[in-house]
Amino acid sequence: MAGIGVKLQKIYDRRTILANLAGFGYSTMVTIAPMFVVIGNVMLMSHFLGYETVGYARRGLFSGTVLYIFIFSLLVAAPFNAVLSRYMSDIIYEEKYEDILPCYDVGLFLNICFGCLFAIPFCIREYLKGQVDLVFVFTGFCGFISLLLVFYSMLYLSICKDYQKISLFFLMGMAAAFGLAWLLVKVFHRDIIYSMLLSLTIGFFLTAAISAATIKSYFKRNSRQYRKVLHYFKIYWHLIATNLLYTLGLYIHNFIFWTTDLKMTVAHTFVYAPAYDMATCLAMFTNLSSTIIFIRRVEMHFHERYKAYSEAVIGGRWEDIKNAKNK
């Protein structure tokens, strides 16, 4: 399953300014395009559907719901994905491709259960204490689970080196979300905030469903060796803690500021600091170029050189090993 390295190499081999721009654009498309697609979709919906005409409290409820959906779906997926990624790497190396579907099924079950463990009590609090409409609460819950499944499916598509399809699936899901939101607001005259949340939820679910179908099309055989997957969680429990703490470190500063005077509380449930959260979002944008450059260099140079080094270690001479290592 070819990655993007071969295509990037062909682009950069032309050695022209236009080729460099094309290579950078292609790298951007397959690395950070999904994030920009979601952000762009929310901005377009806000602009064309009259988001600014909605009351401040309703806008705060929508912002808090979307913010929590993104942050906590990523945090919930983090502990399991590290171990599952290790398991996937091992079985791919051993060429036991029939063990991939059991890994997918176990991970899917664990992510949903773990997500519900935290989301259901939160939603109950949102409904009872925050007096938020039950339909709105349930839609937010479905959006959280759907995005959780999207992040989980991205693990398998990334291992398959199918970065282009990840971007394409996000584009399809968000295009459907924008179209549905436009239809609900402009044609059926439904509530703007709920229409946007419902449309985003359906868009995330569509992205997750297409991703799952693609994974199933890649790996058709199922060994049903589910215990082997669970055994890895016992062996590599430290990966669970490491990846959770790493992901938590990305947002812990936000959580700290949510306890300061900058915080805003919506519906006695959602707590966030809009000023600081916006500042960290803008700061994140300044680092996107490094992400693109890193992925490009890994895809174009690291994989092939690491493969050559591994082959030299297995059956090469000492000189071959040293030469491969120095590269």
Feature locations, PLM:
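Hydrophobic alpha-helical transmembrane segments
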Residues: 169-216
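Alpha-helical transmembrane segments of multi-pass membrane proteins
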Residues: 67-72, 109-113, 121-153, 327
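Transmembrane helical elements of multi-pass membrane transporters/channels
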Residues: 199-299
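C-terminal transmembrane helix end/exit motif
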Residues: 1-20, 155-159, 185, 202-226
